[in-house]
């Protein structure tokens, strides 16, 4: 793109000491088609070395190959559309009006104040002794003709960028996190709108600092749902965990320490059947000694017999529940030929806990009793 009329290519030395302020914003041409994507650009205001008391506004490219533009400040029309939304109209013959969307509300306010002061200073004449405005100056002077704030009643809705090809998604995500942490609702909403418009997939998680401190000891009652002695096949273990860990991470820890695959684990904490993606803290785990229940379900067996994984699991079950291995040999032999005794109550379809027959819901996870379960039929069998 060639430099617009009344302007010139930006200076090659961005570290010049005359630069007053440089900020980043998402910039695109208004009136262009949707194929014209917003680009992350740097807005720069500096003193004009050839004209004391005057200033130049630059629109600098950040990515390799991007064209940088620059105009005398008095030759452009700069309009403030909203807290984070501005418009920049170069002199006639230029590329057209630019939509400028700031990612940071504080930078937007600082930039607008500096442009107002610099414009007012430039209108006072070419006096070389005039003070140069700084970013710390307050916008006490009234808006000049070339920096026009839009009245609140007529402010249009935020003009979001139409593309995401040149937007740095990681920077936008960082700005979103900073805005939320700083309590800046407007900035957070605007950045979130840009990310949502371009369907950017995010993984929003709390920082570990917001969780209770760890590690702590979780007291786990393990129930073996596969044992014929289900009423007495329980064991107690202590696990060292962090409250910010997810249930999925806890399942992997149990798999690593005891060999029980996550597929056979059902965790119940605080009378809730735990979901893998939620944290332990979300179920109230915060201090040493907090209780949890782990139910071990029966895993599907291969047609050819036990797999090495099942053999390992059986050995671990034997260590946790030694009483199941101390049955008399004749009882073990007869148990295979005799039908199993009827289970009192009904089995929860979610956590497999055996509930009393008169309970309408599961005592552990509050799941409703299956409608198909009939206490008379269960007793007769």
Curated annotation (Swiss-Prot):
One of its GO terms (molecular function) is protein-containing complex binding. Pathway: Protein modification; protein ubiquitination. Expressed in brain, spleen, lung, heart, skeletal muscle, kidney and testis (at protein level). Expressed in heart and testis. It comes from the Eukaryota. Residues 172-305 are annotated as: Interaction with SHANK1. Residues 216-285 form the Ubiquitin-like domain. Residues 1-177 are annotated as: Self-association. One of its GO terms (cellular component) is cytosol. The Ubiquitin-like domain is required for the interaction with RNF31. The RanBP2-type zinc fingers mediate the specific interaction with ubiquitin. Binds preferentially linear polyubiquitin chains and 'Lys-63'-linked polyubiquitin chains over 'Lys-48'-linked polyubiquitin chains. Also binds monoubiquitin. PANTHER family: SHARPIN, UBIQUITIN CONJUGATING ENZYME 7 INTERACTING PROTEIN-RELATED. This is Sharpin. It comes from Rattus norvegicus. The gene is Sharpin.
């Amino acid at each position: 793109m060639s430099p617009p009329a009344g302007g010139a290519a930006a200076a090659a030395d961005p570290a010049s000491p005359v630069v007053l302020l440089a900020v980043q914003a998402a910039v695109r041409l208004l009136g262009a088609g949707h194929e014209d994507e917003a680009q992350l650009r740097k807005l720069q205001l500096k003193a004009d070395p050839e004209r004391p008391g005057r200033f130049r506004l630059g629109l600098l490219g950040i990515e390799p190959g991007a064209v940088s533009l620059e105009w005398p400040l008095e030759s452009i029309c700069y309009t403030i559309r909203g807290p984070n939304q501005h418009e920049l109209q170069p002199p006639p013959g230029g590329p057209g009006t630019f939509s400028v969307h700031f990612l940071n509300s504080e930078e937007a306010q600082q930039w607008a104040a500096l442009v107002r002061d610099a414009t007012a200073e430039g209108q006072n004449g070419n006096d070389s002794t005039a003070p140069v405005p700084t970013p710390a100056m307050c916008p006490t002077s009234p808006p000049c003709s070339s920096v026009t704030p839009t009245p609140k009643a007529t402010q249009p809705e935020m003009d979001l960028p139409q593309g995401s090809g040149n937007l740095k998604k990681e920077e936008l995500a960082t700005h979103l996190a900073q805005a939320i942490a700083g309590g800046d609702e407007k900035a957070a909403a605007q950045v979130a709108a840009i990310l949502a418009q371009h369907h950017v997939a995010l993984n929003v998680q709390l920082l570990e600092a917001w969780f209770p401190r760890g590690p702590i000891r979780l007291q786990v009652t393990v129930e073996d749902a596969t044992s014929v002695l289900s009423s007495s096949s329980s064991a107690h273990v202590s696990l060292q965990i962090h409250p910010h860990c997810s249930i999925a991470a806890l399942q992997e820890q149990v798999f690593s320490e005891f060999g029980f695959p996550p597929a056979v684990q059902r965790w119940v904490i605080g009378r809730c059947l735990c979901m893998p993606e939620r944290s332990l803290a979300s179920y109230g785990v915060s201090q040493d000694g907090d209780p949890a229940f782990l139910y071990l379900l029966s895993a599907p067996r291969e047609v050819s017999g036990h797999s090495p994984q099942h053999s390992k699991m059986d050995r671990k079950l034997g260590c946790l529940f030694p009483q199941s291995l101390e049955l008399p040999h004749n009882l073990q032999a007869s148990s295979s030929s005799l039908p199993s005794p009827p289970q009192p109550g009904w089995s929860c379809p979610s956590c497999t806990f055996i509930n009393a027959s008169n309970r309408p819901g599961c005592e552990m996870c509050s799941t409703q009793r299956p409608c198909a379960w009939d206490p008379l039929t269960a007793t007769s069998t």
